[in-house]
């Protein structure tokens, strides 16, 4: 046996065949025992409430400050509400949750740290820009599948006011926006991932149907950073589309699949410009995904009436759309299998001011009706 064979046998002996059996290709995992997505909750702002998904959100507020004094505190309040709602739907006490995976767009992840501190759940703070919901869900599902705990919580958020202050201009400045710019979504999405379905203890719980009973995360494809050298932070769709292409293509290659194996391939916030680039890049690799594609940033707002230019963006865009609109369709069997691919533009105010390019990242989550 050659050195590679000896090495593989040593790894299998150390980690066990169970570990190796879940790996697929270069970047993917298919879970031997797929975790359940038990519940999800969405909290959104006033503009989102006026959009096409307004009636789908669990909680909306006409006051985008959510009773707070600052945009940052408002975003934290959204995260807290989303987590409490998600846990409440599944009747799970925060003390039963092993780990929380969360993040946002702000420096040092302050929206998350201030938002979830009262829950007192051990936390991994994440940053994947607008792909954070995918990163959090992937890690939560991997942790449950590995046996590290029965319950994991994933949460993320964004806020138009806090993002404008952080990355662009204070709202009072009233700067003009190019048509390629996105509108940061004011929303939060939280998801409870578990190893088993909880028992329904009463007719009231059964009637509410608040807990999902037919959704599993069957696998993930973890993305790589892809940088095409673009520097225009007001055209994030173009910056993120190459990363989305790379991850979707890798999912197809790792698993021997095509777009026909999914009811929907759903990106996070490529918007109208990014979607067009994604179609071209995927076609150059031999795949036509046009009839299967949906983008959360194009879904959450009405482009004609809400003047959001290229579409919605932000961590809360993909997260709240998944929680409010996509998962119910999987639960009722309308969609049997989707590939959820949140996308992120990895930039900061420092990198932008120094003239650095804007790399992209995308993670793919395979979610199925069961």
Where are these predicted regions, by residue range?
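Active-site-proximal alpha-helical scaffold in enzymes
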Residues: 127-154, 193, 313-334
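Conserved beta-ketoacyl condensing-enzyme motif
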Residues: 37, 72-131, 261-276
């Amino acid at each position: 046996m050659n050195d590679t064979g000896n090495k593989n046998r040593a790894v299998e002996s150390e980690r066990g065949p169970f570990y190796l059996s879940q790996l697929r290709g270069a970047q993917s995992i298919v879970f031997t025992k797929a975790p359940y997505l038990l519940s999800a909750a969405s909290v959104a702002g006033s503009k989102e409430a006026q959009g096409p998904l307004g009636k789908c959100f669990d909680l909306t507020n006409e006051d985008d400050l959510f009773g707070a004094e600052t945009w940052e505190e408002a975003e934290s309040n959204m995260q807290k509400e989303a987590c409490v709602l998600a846990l409440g739907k599944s009747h799970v006490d925060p003390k039963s949750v092993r780990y929380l995976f969360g993040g946002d767009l702000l420096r040092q992840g302050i929206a998350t740290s201030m938002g979830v501190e009262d829950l007192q759940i051990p936390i991994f703070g994440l940053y994947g820009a607008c792909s954070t919901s995918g990163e959090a869900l992937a890690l939560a599902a991997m942790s449950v599948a590995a046996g590290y705990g029965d319950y994991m919580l994933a949460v993320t958020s964004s806020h138009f006011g806090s993002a404008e202050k952080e990355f662009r201009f204070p709202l009072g400045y009233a700067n003009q926006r190019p048509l390629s710019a996105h509108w940061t979504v004011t929303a939060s999405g939280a998801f409870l991932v578990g190893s088993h379905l909880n028992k329904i203890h009463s007719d009231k719980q059964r009637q509410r149907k608040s807990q999902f009973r037919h959704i599993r995360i069957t696998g993930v494809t973890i993305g790589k950073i892809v940088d095409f050298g673009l520097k225009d932070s007001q055209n994030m769709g173009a910056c993120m589309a190459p990363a989305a292409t790379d991850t979707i293509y890798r999912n197809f290659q790792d698993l021997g699949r095509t777009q026909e194996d999914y009811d929907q391939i759903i990106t996070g916030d490529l918007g109208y410009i990014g979607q067009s680039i994604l179609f071209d890049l995927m076609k150059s690799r031999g795949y036509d995904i046009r009839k299967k594609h949906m983008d959360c940033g194009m879904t959450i707002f009405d482009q004609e009436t809400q003047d959001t230019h290229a579409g919605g963006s932000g961590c809360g865009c993909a997260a709240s759309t998944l929680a409010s609109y996509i998962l119910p369709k999987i639960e009722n069997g309308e969609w049997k299998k989707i590939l959820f691919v949140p996308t992120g533009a990895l930039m900061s105010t420092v990198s932008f001011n120094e003239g650095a390019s804007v790399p992209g990242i995308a993670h793919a989550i395979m979610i199925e009706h069961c």
